[in-house]
């Protein structure tokens, strides 16, 4: 099966939307305080937040059985910098981003996923509207309906 994964993030929250056919599932979460992760998840930039959203979006999608083993996931990037990091699989100077890439690669390997990265115009990012306040009520803040 094929999916499109849209994601966005800022210093307070991150969101992701998984589109499978005509069905779109939207989720949004607040970043936990940094002390809960021993300082490892001290989000300092929107780019870091987007990498968290990408990692959590894939992990969550697998956990609620929307994304399954051997599925193809079209990762919809609205940041050229992030897109370049992902397609080149290059190290950055940001440990949080490098850790997220490592965890994403682990998920891909363990579940035999095929990721295909796409660079898109930010106005086409359907996950962005949940952070902007325009459509906050359409994204779920929990997984109760999926488990």
Predicted regions and their residues:
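RNase H catalytic domain
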Residues: 55-133
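Basic, amphipathic N-terminal segments that precede the first structured/catalytic domain
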Residues: 1-13, 124, 133-136, 147
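Extended, charge-rich low-complexity interaction segments
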Residues: 141-147
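RNase H-like nuclease fold core
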Residues: 1-48
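Short, low-complexity, polar/charged sequence segments that are solvent-exposed and flexible
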Residues: 23-26, 93-96, 134-139
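Acidic helix/loop or adjacent segment enriched in Glu/Asp that either coordinates divalent metal
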Residues: 28-75
């Amino acid at each position: 099966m094929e999916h499109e994964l849209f994601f966005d993030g800022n210093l307070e929250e991150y969101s992701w939307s998984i589109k499978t056919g005509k069905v779109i599932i939207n989720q949004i979460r607040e970043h936990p305080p940094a002390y809960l992760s021993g300082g490892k998840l001290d989000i300092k930039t929107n780019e870091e937040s987007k990498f968290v959203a990408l990692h959590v979006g894939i992990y969550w999608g697998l956990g609620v059985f929307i994304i399954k083993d051997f599925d193809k996931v079209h990762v919809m990037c609205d940041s050229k910098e992030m897109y370049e990091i992902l397609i080149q699989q290059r190290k950055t100077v940001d440990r949080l981003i490098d850790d997220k890439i490592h965890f994403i690669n682990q998920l891909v390997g363990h579940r035999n996923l095929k990721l295909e990265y796409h660079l898109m115009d930010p106005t086409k990012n359907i996950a962005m509207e949940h952070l902007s306040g325009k459509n906050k009520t359409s994204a779920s803040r929990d997984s109760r309906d999926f488990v």
